[in-house]
Design a protein with these regions (language model features):
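Short beta-strand elements at the ligand-binding edges of bilobed clamshell
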Residues: 1, 29, 100-112
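Extracytoplasmic "Venus flytrap"
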Residues: 1-9, 60-63
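Short beta-strand->loop
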Residues: 1-6, 21, 30-34
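Hinge/cleft segment of the Venus flytrap/periplasmic-binding protein
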Residues: 2, 6, 17-18, 113-167
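Hydrophobic alpha-helical segments within soluble ligand-binding/sensing domains
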Residues: 8-16, 37-43, 91-94, 109-127
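Hydrophobic alpha-helical
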Residues: 14, 28, 33-97
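Flexible loop/hinge segments that line or gate small-molecule binding clefts
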Residues: 91-104, 153
Length: 167
């Protein structure tokens, strides 16, 4: 797997869990889709051309790959829920994909919590206190059913005015 560490870890986590379901056949797990929506679109078209009707579900590990696959599915008329599709990261196009039903879900994180935890742990570490080697800051599955939830809306569209010093 080539790409960013976060995408690689997301892919590994996905594959580790899917391995617990032997009835699910993985058709492709080693296709790097590139760092942009355009390269992801091209790679996604190749996957769709190669596997066509064999595809029942798709997971993409980051915003650009999710965007590219969404465009590719739309271009062949299969973005109607025919292929179950879950991607990672928010962003306007992914949120619109959930609203339209073209994406069954997106997994999002809490960037404020991630940043706050990182700084807090670094301060503790520099003060000589022991800290956990690994900290899970959580992830949330966003679907058409919970998209309008207030907490999810804050994760998708952070109220920056609450965090930015207005001096």
């Amino acid at each position: 797997m080539v790409g960013s560490a976060s995408s690689t870890e997301r892919e590994k986590g996905f594959l580790d869990v899917i391995a617990q379901f032997p009835e699910i056949k993985i058709l492709s797990e080693d296709k790097y889709s590139g760092a942009t929506r355009d390269t992801a679109y091209s790679a996604s078209q190749n996957i769709l051309n190669r596997y066509g009707d064999e595809l029942d579900g798709i997971f993409m590990p980051n915003e650009s790959s999710t965007n590219g696959m969404l465009l590719a599915l739309r271009s062949i008329g299969r973005a109607d829920g025919d292929v179950k599709f879950v991607g990672f990261d928010g962003g306007d196009q992914n949120v619109q994909g959930v609203i339209s039903g073209d994406l069954q879900g997106i997994i999002i994180q809490d960037p404020f919590k991630m940043g706050y935890s990182a700084v807090s742990l670094m301060v503790q570490h520099l003060a000589g206190k022991s800290v956990e080697k690994r900290v899970d800051t959580g992830a949330t599955l966003v679907t058409p059913y919970n998209l309008k939830n207030e907490n999810i809306q804050k994760l998708l569209f952070p109220p920056l005015e609450e965090y930015i010093d207005k001096k």
